[in-house]
């Protein structure tokens, strides 16, 4: 995650519009209540907090990005493979353009499933070296209800 530490000050300038576009697409398709709890795995600077009008939490391994995210929502430093939350703690779990960075993506998917109660949005970078393997892992771990093609990602809406 050294790359993200190095670009942390310019992260939003580089990725804001792209990430907000994905987040808007996710919000349009995922029905949520103000009482719902949303977990953003690989939250970066916490852009998801700008759109979801409910309880939000973020987790990311990069300390420098979390320094920005914690101004927007509660955060924890950690990896997707070892989420520091209780089982079934979140109504919605999102993981946008992060899965390809996991050391063990399958374990990360199982962790998301463990802490979620049934609504998931996971995007996979189309140019990820392991794209096909990641798609298979998501399909094996979750029931994919809808697939949306974004310019750079495939967004999977799962149960």
Where are the model-predicted features located?
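A short glycine-rich, Lys/Arg-flanked "PGG" loop and its adjoining helix->strand segment in the class I
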Residues: 106-119
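Conserved beta-strand signature within the Rossmann-like core of class I S-adenosyl-L-methionine
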Residues: 118-126
């Amino acid at each position: 995650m050294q790359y993200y530490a190095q670009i942390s000050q310019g992260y939003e300038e580089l990725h804001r519009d792209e990430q907000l576009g994905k987040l808007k697409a996710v919000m349009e398709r995922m029905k949520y209540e103000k009482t719902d709890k949303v977990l953003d795995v690989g939250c970066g600077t916490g852009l998801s907090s700008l759109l979801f009008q409910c309880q939000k939490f973020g987790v990311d391994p990069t300390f420098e990005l979390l320094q920005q995210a914690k101004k927007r929502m509660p955060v924890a430093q950690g990896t997707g493979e070892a989420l520091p939350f209780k089982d079934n703690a979140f109504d919605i779990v999102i993981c946008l353009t992060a899965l390809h960075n996991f050391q063990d993506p399958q374990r990360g998917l199982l962790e998301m499933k463990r802490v979620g109660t049934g609504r998931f949005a996971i995007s996979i970078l189309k140019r990820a070296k392991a794209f096909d393997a990641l798609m298979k892992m998501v399909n094996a771990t979750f029931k994919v209800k809808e697939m949306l093609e974004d310019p750079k990602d495939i967004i999977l809406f799962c149960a």
